[in-house]
Amino acid sequence: MIRKIIFAVLCSLGCTLAAAQDWGGRYKLQFSQDEAADYTGDLYLVPLGPEQAEFLLTVVHKAGDTIVYDSTDGPVTLTDGKFVWRFPGGDFDYTLTMELYPESEGGVPLENTIRVSEKVGSGAPPYNIDLSPDGLYRRDLSYFVAPNGYMYHAEGEQCALALGGIYSGRVDLPATVVGPFGKVFTVSGIESDAFAYSRALGQVTIANPDQRVAPGALTWTEIPYDWNKIAMPFFAYPCKSRDRFVIPYYDGFKSPENNFQWVIFKQGVAPSKLSGNTIGKDNALSGRVDQAFDRTMGTFYTLQIPKAEINKMFRGYEAMEIEALVADMDFVAFHTFPPFSRWKFPEKVQNAPKAIVNQVARKYGREVMYSRRVAWLRDGYGELDLVEFQHKNHQAMVVFAWIIGNDVAATCSLTTDIESEFDDVDVWNVDDDGTFGIPDVVTIAKDPEGNVIIFLAKNSPESISCFALRQVGDKLERIDFDQWYRYIDIN
């Protein structure tokens, strides 16, 4: 889908003259060692010529308060080594000065540094929060502005789009760009916050399918989000070293279209590359085969990150405890993956809040058997709870509830006859006591509107059922994916 989408970013900044490369780039607010850095500042300067530039200045407090200034109403002009910007419209008597060649208190020139200072005339500044953009901003030399006017973040021989500009409606991502001193970089893709301050992003093209659009990058844009056109991810499991993953084969299985995919586990998202296929091989086994990973019938992917990052991504989990997703670029680019905690065996089980249980019980009119907290966002703004009811008329019933604040935002109920044989695609897989238990949350994805898609794996001794719950209004829509047979012994 990404190759077919034409998406855009605000950026027709024109060609950048070589003389302006001396100061074009990204600058970060500096703090002394004895200062408490509870906020950050970033200044982006994109040259339009030797004496004009577009700029973006952001100051963000850790609590969320933000100042954003930019040159929406026209570029700033260099005069006597300073860019001076005045708040547009006349509503505020406010001036921002960006001095390119500042000196220390002792008169020593400060290289790769810009001094930002604000001047408030009569009245108050345009913001009413306890922040100020004042300070010294030091250049991050890993960022550069290419002749096409885009800002890139370099790493080795490659670079990724870091800021596509802010004031036009289209960006065409090139295959290569010329950086400082004439060095040619291969453009690897787009960073996740490259469009964070865009206003009318409507059209962008990428040069080739090997370029990657980072997680959440398109959530900032005006590109239409259509769940029905996004390629669904696949459930997968890892080898013992957790650097290779396989999507087990099932009837009707079609391998992902692109060789480059992303592996998702909890909030971790890492690039991967196609590395094997055993579909149709005589000795291949369909299901989860932990004892003989390479005999799994399916499609294999290898992570493209260092071992240290793999260890961090799966810290606290052995391979046999992991189910993950293999996802195409369009799914990853249109969703964010917030950090969350989940229940993990053998941790102590936590009951869901009593007020939530009461809300769910009233909604469904059943007597509660037990409740469980399944997973909760670390920012405190979202929680998945599970409530199982007493059996009624030989029927078992469990409800998943997505909680925001103190209220039930969306629910999904699952029922089954307790005396029936469970279908192969059933997500119940009840334990010996006839209860549902707690499924493993593989990841929680958020779409551009903030709705969640929760991917779960329900483990039992002989199989794993993979499904998802997608928030649609006040309902969690259940999406069945696959059920794996778990091989215990291999003859």
What name fits each language-model region?
Residues 369-381, 440-448:
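Structural signature of eukaryotic scaffold interfaces centered on beta-propeller domains
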